[in-house]
Design a protein with these regions (language model features):
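Conserved beta-strand/loop positions that form the S-adenosyl-L-methionine
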Residues: 49
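Class I SAM-dependent methyltransferase SAM/SAH-binding core
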Residues: 45, 53-102
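Conserved class I S-adenosyl-L-methionine
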Residues: 1-41
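A short, conserved alpha-helix within the catalytic core of class I
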Residues: 122-131
Length: 278
C-alpha cells in the first residue's frame, strides 16, 4: 500500500524560472470579471495563497490597495518580486515565504483571499479555517481560481499542429516511472477535489461561480512547451537528477518531429472562478 502523500519543500523546486513562460495564462478578462463580481475598487487588500511567481497576484494588483503573496518556494518569490518591480508595483506588493498552514501573525485583515491552482496542495480544512479568520467578516471572499476542466480545446483550424500532449506524458513516464511524482513522494490518485464541502465545514455559507471564457488562439514555440513541462510538479527539473539533459534533448526531438517548424497552436483555456463569502 502506498504511503499517504505529504508535502515537502521540493514540490516545485527548480520550476520557478520556467513557470511564467511555460504556463498558459488565465483567460483574458479575469480581473474585470472579478472586480465586477466583488465590487473591487482599488481600496481593499488581497492575500494570494500559494502565489508562485505572482501569476495571479500581479494582474489583480490594480484592484487593491495592497497585495500580499505567500509561497513556501524562495525561487517563486524571487520571480514574483522581480516581475513586480518591472511592473512598478514594488510599493503595493509584499512577498512572504511561508506555507499556507503556517501563515505568520500580523498579516492583517483582507478583502479577498485567492488560491490560483494551489488549494489542492494544502491541508485544506486547516487553511480554510485560518484564512476565514483573516477575511473581513462582512463579505470577505475566499476565491478559488483554476482552468475550466470541461470543454474541448481543439487546435482544429489553427495554423500549427497541436502540442503532442500524450507523447510528452509518455516520455515523462519513461524517465520518472508510471506513477505521478510529487516532491519526494508519489501521487497515484491525483490531487483532491470537493472544495465545496471543505469550505462549508469551515463556515463559508455562500458560493458563487463564474466562468471567464477562453478559446483564443495561442502560438507556442518549442521553448515554450519545454518550459511548460519543466514548470510542472510532476516533471520538475530536480526529479530527473543527472538525466535532466537527456530528458530535455529527447523532449525537443519529440517536439521537432511533431512540428518541424517548431511552432504549435493551442486555445486559451477558460477560467473557472468559485467564490465563497464570509
Amino acid at each position: 500500500m502506498t504511503d499517504p502523500w505529504q508535502w515537502d519543500e521540493t514540490l516545485f523546486a527548480g520550476t520557478a524560472p520556467h513557470y511564467r513562460r511555460g504556463r498558459l495564462p488565465y483567460a483574458p478578462g479575469l480581473p474585470e470579471s472579478l472586480a465586477a463580481e466583488l465590487g473591487l475598487d482599488g481600496r481593499g487588500r488581497l492575500l494570494d495563497v500559494g502565489c508562485g511567481p505572482g501569476t495571479l497576484a500581479l494582474p489583480l494588483a490594480h484592484l487593491f490597495r495592497e497585495v500580499v503573496g505567500v509561497d513556501p518556494d524562495p525561487g517563486m518569490l524571487a520571480e514574483a518580486e522581480r516581475d513586480a518591480s518591472g511592473r512598478g508595483l514594488t510599493g503595493r506588493t509584499r512577498w512572504v515565504r511561508a506555507r499556507a498552514e503556517q501563515l505568520p501573525d500580523g498579516l492583517g485583515e483582507f478583502t479577498v483571499a485567492t488560491f490560483g491552482n494551489s488549494f489542492h496542495w494544502m491541508d485544506r480544512a486547516r487553511v480554510a479555517a485560518t484564512v476565514r479568520g483573516l477575511l473581513r467578516p462582512d463579505g470577505g471572499a475566499f476565491v478559488h481560481i483554476a482552468d475550466l476542466k470541461t470543454g474541448a480545446r481543439s487546435a482544429e483550424g489553427l495554423p500549427h499542429p497541436a502540442v503532442p500532449g500524450a507523447a510528452v506524458a509518455d516520455l515523462v513516464r519513461r524517465y520518472l516511472g508510471p506513477v505521478r511524482r510529487a516532491g519526494r513522494g508519489l501521487l497515484p490518485d491525483g490531487t483532491p477535489g470537493g472544495e465545496d464541502e471543505v469550505l462549508a465545514r469551515a463556515g463559508f455559507p455562500h458560493r458563487r461561480r463564474l466562468v471567464v471564457p477562453g478559446g483564443q488562439p495561442l502560438e507556442r514555440t518549442v521553448d515554450d512547451v519545454v518550459a511548460g513541462v519543466l514548470s510542472m510538479s510532476y516533471s520538475a527539473p530536480h526529479l530527473f537528477g543527472e538525466r535532466l539533459g537527456a530528458f530535455e534533448a529527447d523532449l525537443r526531438r519529440l517536439l521537432h518531429t511533431a512540428s518541424p517548424a517548431g511552432l504549435f497552436s493551442e486555445r486559451q483555456p477558460s477560467t473557472e472562478v468559485r467564490i465563497w463569502l464570509n
